[in-house]
């Protein structure tokens, strides 16, 4: 954990906030109050659930691919830093 850079921490925290927000919306507890009459149909509920699932999946894939979280990724980052190709 000592060797995780600031960018990874910030992206991880923002991802966590986004995932909590989507989960709350999915279970009917929106952070921003929305009138109940705005969501009446099954299509709206399915759209919300599908949107949340897509957001979660896409966020996790992007986070995993854009951060050096595996041992191989950490070695790649070291090589890139030695060559001056990354921060």
Curated annotation (Swiss-Prot):
The chain crosses the membrane at residues 42-62. It comes from the Bacteria. Its main location: membrane. Signal peptide: none annotated. InterPro entries: Holin. One of its GO terms (cellular component) is membrane. It holds the Pfam family Holin_SPP1. Keywords: Membrane, Transmembrane, Transmembrane helix. It is found in: Membrane. It is a single-pass membrane protein. Belongs to the SPP1 holin family. This is Uncharacterized 9.5 kDa protein in ORF3 5'region. It comes from Bacillus licheniformis.
């Amino acid at each position: 954990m000592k060797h995780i850079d600031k960018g990874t921490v910030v992206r991880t925290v923002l991802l966590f906030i986004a995932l909590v927000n989507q989960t709350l919306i999915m279970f009917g507890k929106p952070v921003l109050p929305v009138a109940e009459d705005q969501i009446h149909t099954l299509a709206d509920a399915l759209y919300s659930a599908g949107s949340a699932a897509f957001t979660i999946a896409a966020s996790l894939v992007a986070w995993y691919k854009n951060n050096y979280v595996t041992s191989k990724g950490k070695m790649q980052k070291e090589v890139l830093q030695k060559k001056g190709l990354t921060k």
